[in-house]
Amino acid sequence: MRPQSLTPLFAQTTSLPGIGPRLGKLVEKLAGPLVVDLLWHLPFAVVDRRHAPEVAHAKAGEIATITVTVEEHLVPRNPRQPYRVWCSDETGRLCLTYFNGREDYLKKLLPPGEVRVVSGKVEIYQGEVQMTHPDHVVPPDQREQILRVEPVYGLTAGLTQRPVQKAIATAVERSPELPEWQDAAFRKRNKWDGWHAALARAHAPDEETDLSPMHPARARLAFDELLASQLAIALVRHHNRTVAGHVTKGDGRVRTKVLKNLPFELTPSQKAAVGEIEADMAKPERMIRLLQGDVGSGKTLVALLAMLIGVEAGAQAALMAPTEILARQHHATIAPLAEAAGVRLALLTGRDGQKQKKETLQGLADGSIHLVVGTHALVQEEVEFADLALAVVDEQHRFGVHQRMALSSKGHAVDLLVMTATPIPRTLMLAAYGDLDVSKLTEKPAGRQPIDTRTIPLERIGEVADAVGRQIAGGGRVYWVCPLIEESEDIDLANAEERFRLLSAHFPGKVGLLHGRLKGAEREATMAAFAEGRLSILVATTVIEVGVDVPAATVMVIEHAERFGLAQLHQLRGRVGRGAAKSACLLLYAQPLGETAKARLAIMRETEDGFRIAEEDLRLRGAGELLGTRQSGLPDMRLADLAAHAELLQAARDDARLVIERDPDLQSERGAALRALLYLFRRDDAVRTLRAG
């Protein structure tokens, strides 16, 4: 149960003074629904209001706090005109300007003849000193409250600084003193304050440098967040190791048949990955392993060989893909090999006919089907296995944790292999999975040629179209990707449709269009026409599925490449170069290019190594944006910056390991404090869900 002391932090933000239902909705959108969410919403800038000149000495552009006497209100006749309030001190006059100002409100705020302290940005307009909508107007006895460095918080539409500052200040006040969960020697070495003092300090910066992620207060809080995350992962890992697993040993007879039917040798890293998986499956503990392989590195084959270990042991295995296109593709790759090895394989998707579905469900339940490939249809309640030994989940950041769990729970202590084509930098791997066992596929299969990557200004699009014409005349196939502009799906669609129209005029009957609004069946028909060569050019917004395999595709054109992230560019480029023919990737960009965009395109030209590209992407963009953490299954860090805090992440991992060695049930005095930490960062539910791997 959550410690009693944390109760005030887990109240709704509407329990804070000044936050009613309307503001509550906006605050929830900004930071989250609970008081604790506001604690993690740190300021990104400061405003120094300590400068208090007389009117005559106030300079344009500076933030000033000035004490004045209110003289007169000039109420506009026309509501479009500004409302002006003239004030003065001994040195000169100051005009306070309000647009859409209400007379009753302003006369109450600034009563004529009274002294007021105003703070805001100074402007000089037609020789007059002026402030438009001052940030603060208070009586002289509240002057000291304004004369300070003020934190500036990120906002969402409809919110202003004042209520957010007030709500966060109250949230910090309500935060309890908690028992220290950090290792005493480690904290002393870093010269860090206690949790509560660090929190108060992070929300009350004195100058710009206090906003650095390396400032002691911020570093302390970042470490706490990382420790909670690493400890949650380590606890689950420990729990999984103590739960008796399936000992699954194969004798190699089925795999030998498959390997004989391959027209090529496995790469060294494919062999190593299969060896690691085989050793894991033979252990009494449950396997949870990540198979990381760049686009086109042969993950499906490794997955098949892993699944066949289960079949050799007399059990079953399942592979779950995020989309029907991918499930069908995996099935098509595996089917001839399964047939050659005498293994019964089925496909299960949401669009199967009743008769076929019934047969598949029957075969899985009685064990006559050995392998199944499917979409999330596999996790439906009606799906039962006779004896599921291995669950393989492809492109896992598309699945919610509960879907991974659901597939794993279709048997007893099912081994889990998670495949991803997204090369994740080491730091992010550690943050997301702790010490998860990882197999990496680093080489491309034999016979694949390097891709010729070029950057070309958009003005030369005519030459690109001519080059595309030459490619398709020789039987090549071309992807043409139009960028996704986040704000508007309509604009994207218009861009893609316009490009489709222009290319169709050049190459009638040869061009297809693929975008997010097409129904599943239309998308699949278009993809099939392209794969079979009835279409030579496929114009698409970025919905070309990860893993879609068209070996005859030799050219990838990406319009406005400067708008894409590195990981995305790399994923798209991986759609070509999958056959033996020479392939090219043409990155079209609009001038002038910003520094980051320049660096991104340069890296694309230099290397095809997805792991190096991922590290560069982390360096250029920071972890938050890297994979769009929200959809990626990676933890959504509020305080830690994985690029800046890589060393703290390592330290948090080491500390979590030590805790598990010494006190796996968190029963000691420090253990009790660490439980509070897990609740504070809401890792109590993560402890439950992470059992899915």
Features from the language model and the residues they span:
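Short, surface-exposed secondary-structure boundary micro-motifs
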Residues: 69, 121-122, 561, 575
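C-terminal accessory region of SF2 helicases/translocases
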Residues: 580, 584, 592-693
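Short boundary/loop segments of OB/S1/cold-shock single-stranded nucleic-acid-binding domains
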Residues: 44-64
